[in-house]
Amino acid sequence: MEELKFQNRRDFLKKFTLGSAALLSLSSFKFISRTKKRNVTKITVLHTNDMHSHIDPFDKMDKNYPNMGGMIKIAKLIEQIRKKEDNILLLDAGDIFQGTPYFNFFKGEVEFKLMSAMRYDASTMGNHDFDNGIEGFKNMLPHASFPFICSNYDFKNTSLKNHTRKFKIFNKAGLKIGVLGIGIQLDGLVPKKLYGNTIYKDPYVCANYYADLLRNKYKCDLIICVSHLGYSYSDK
């Protein structure tokens, strides 16, 4: 087994705002082999959430975020980090859609194409990713080169059946990294006609089930939960 050492680098990217709540965060994980010769493998995890179709920066006259944010700027930042780091995992926690005319006119095509160009590894779905309905989301998937991981949404009775994953395992520098994705309760938050027959399952039960599966069956060295639940959550 290997020892996991976590190094938080929030100071490097304290407040890189994409939208009203979106943030690119960076963390580094160092795996140290328990042998006489201590070989260190560094994994860098980049994470975004709530991008809400903000392709361009805010207006330079904006009182709160002058000339800040936007997927174009974040793409440049990601490229800068890729030049310095070798083993990168780029993830998104949902609410990619809704918030600017880009979504109203192009229905998600622009967002998915940009994220594909940025080489995202995976994303989960937020409530606003249902804003064009299940069929609308499915129609945009050909523009995404990355998978959507939805561990607690059951799409078996919808057109999204077999178009998302429950988890995904990534291999980085000889390490197995398991990623699962958790979504929010849709009932009462999203109109029923938009999510259709999607079955919502308890996020805590699903997260623990897949974490156990990834750890014990698939022998992952690290497990990451990409969650759209926020810091404090209850669906009761």
Residues covered by each model-derived region:
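Acidic, metal/ion-coordinating pockets
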Residues: 2-236
